[in-house]
Amino acid sequence: MDRRGFNRRMLLGGAAVVGTGAVATSLSVAPEAASADGPARTAPAGGEVRHIKLYAEKLADGQLGYGFEKGKATIPGPLIELNEGDTLHIEFENTLDVAASLHVHGLDYEISSDGTKLNRSDVEPGGTRTYTWRTHAPGRRKDGTWRAGSAGYWHYHDHVVGTEHGTGGIRKGLYGAVIVRRKGDILPDATHTIVFNDLLINNKPAHSGPDFEATVGDRVEFVVITHGEYYHTFHMHGHRWADNRTGLLTGPEDPSQVIDNKIVGPADSFGFQVIAGEGVGAGAWMYHCHVQSHSDMGMVGLFLVKKTDGTIPGYEPHEHGGQQTGAERRTGTGQRPEHAH
């Protein structure tokens, strides 16, 4: 069967996580995307009710992570993709020796799925709890005002480990990305999650990336999340995006500002898509925090854009290693899709 025929699936991301040997995964309901040299594929309508299992685990290096399977937790946790109108039931199991939880930004949920100690929606060591997230399309309220939809680049994280508000859990890696797509949104060839967490990226050691690969012409999506105590600026060399919900311009009259640098603070999240190497070609394109002292201290990674023959002009691997680390979704890689349950 053509892989494009799968509309409900869980895709393996193929990204190694430092110190764990685990594989980052992605839960996706989107059809396979096409590259920029062909017609763009788009997100379908939502309305599905889905069920997944998620674990909180301690990693071999002492950090913490979320995973779809025991023993396969990652930092960042699995990328979760939904379409407006979907409902997701998450059976959350806490394998840690301290209480943990799951809290999401941007989606709809009842107080029992808030994931905090203040309303007793956390999970004790060894316990389980079902968190339910709902999404909705935009529409007009009965009073005539407009209600925004759920579509956007969001994120989830622990809210109780270490302190009453979860500072320790976030610091050690209990976080991940959520994408809610609107019907008709353009789909990428690959999605990568980048988390500025204090002075680290995806909790990797300073000056070690993560680095992400693409081939010239690929449509690549980045989800950028900020945690910790600091404000940063996210900058990517050689590529630009629109400062709006999707990161894409809708046409020549779209008033959205086109940028290559964005100020971000704790709990901020945004996303965008670029065509790898568009107008600039292949290369080792740097992304980093543009607070100069932060980049000097190691908040730097590479967007490795290859020619079609696989080469990268002027690039020789150096200390910025760790290619394709963190949660990601890739399409067209020949990996076997798994049905979501």
Predicted regions and their residues:
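N-terminal, post-signal-peptide metal-ligating segments of extracellular/periplasmic oxidoreductases
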Residues: 2-130, 188-192, 196-220, 299-317, ...
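Histidine- and aromatic-enriched segments that form or immediately flank copper-ligand environments
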Residues: 50-179, 230-265, 285-303
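Short, well-ordered beta-strand elements within core beta-sheets of diverse protein domains
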Residues: 132, 141, 211-213, 223, ...
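Short, structured patches in soluble enzyme cores that scaffold and shape functional sites
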Residues: 135, 160, 180-182, 195-198, ...
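Intrinsically disordered, low-complexity Ser/Thr- and acidic-rich flexible linkers and loops
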Residues: 141-147, 330, 336-341
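An exposed, glycine/acidic-rich loop-and-rim segment of catalytic or binding clefts
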Residues: 167-202
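A contiguous, surface-exposed recognition patch within enzymatic or periplasmic domains that forms
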Residues: 187, 193-239, 243, 277-285
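C-terminal functional regions that serve as terminal interaction/effector modules
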Residues: 232, 259-326, 332-334
